Amino acid sequence: MTAETAAVDARPVASSQRVGVLLVNLGTPDALGYWPVRRYLKEFLSDRRVVNTPRLIWWPILNLIILTTRPQRSSKNYETIWNSQRNESPLKTVTRSQAEQLAGSIVSGEFGAGGDIVVDWAMRYANPSILSSLQRLREQGCGRVLIVPLYPQFAGATTLSVADKVEESLARMNWRPDMRSVPPYYNDPVYIDALAQSVRAGLAALDFEPEVVLVSFHGIPKSYVEAGDPYYDQCVETWRLLRERLDFSPERCPLTFQSRFGRAEWLSPYTDETVKELARKGVRRMAVLTPGFSVDCLETISEIGVENREFFIEAGGEQFALIPCLNDSALGMKVIRHIVSRELEGWI
């Protein structure tokens, strides 16, 4: 027997009944500082699903301009939200907690299958990687794997990019378990209800009553939607259903898109411009929620909670609040347990 054969034989035999559940979020630098942030940005911005500019044009822009200037600035932004105790960003802290709580629900018998379900978590970019997490599931004998992209609304740059990486990783591993993936849950009643409850609780905790409760989604280039990406329509539907549940008019609860990058036209109206415009028109009290993010991160805590707050105050606003994402709260975990339980039907 060769050493290679022995290594193969030593692998755990997959149980066709054991299910691996893999929660996946976007990603975060492994540490603060120029080089860790640069590595993260390079992986992220090299993804053709994220930036589909021809490589001959994009390579020099990315490597000679963006990756020489942006890492230092981004690192300073990450410093403001960094979990110094764990030396990681909140995105990693909370996603780990979501996986641990989901695993705890399984152990307690909520899914009725006990040890036949293994839960892990991964990031699309940086660590823990999708490849390493799939390897752990294989080592634990999983013969079935459910991928859970933590993106309520589908976008090629997020959901489809996760699918690409999963396929690439499985090919590298020469492994083909039975596979399922959680579909977008942008209109799921459990998700909408959790958002509504979270917004009500967030507003009730404020010491002021917002005149405007703005809903901000991450933007994508308009050309992606024109090419068929359903992201915009799904964001609009989430916004509509949430407004109906809260009994808010479009004027009280406008829809915007944030985080635009580069010179191309992105989905609009833009969050930063809307915040300034509303303040200039006399709005003095505002709250913002970001229902497309399952976990608070740089784009919510810093971009909305700090940068857009400053825009609002500088333009004449007085009171501004960021309503937290669902995160690993009881409401957030209710959504995750619901979508996982639904997609595991027939497997457990």
From Swiss-Prot:
It is an enzyme of class 4 (lyase). Pathway: Porphyrin-containing compound metabolism; protoheme biosynthesis; protoheme from protoporphyrin-IX: step 1/1. It comes from Methylocella silvestris (strain DSM 15510 / CIP 108128 / LMG 27833 / NCIMB 13906 / BL2). Transmembrane segments: none annotated. The keyword Cytoplasm applies. Fe cation binds at H218, E299. GO terms for cellular component: cytoplasm. InterPro entries: Ferrochelatase (IPR001015), Ferrochelatase_AS (IPR019772), Ferrochelatase_C (IPR033644), Ferrochelatase_N (IPR033659). This is Ferrochelatase. It is found in: Cytoplasm. It catalyses: heme b + 2 H(+) = protoporphyrin IX + Fe(2+). Keywords: Cytoplasm, Heme biosynthesis, Iron, Lyase, Metal-binding, Porphyrin biosynthesis. Its EC number is 4.98.1.1.
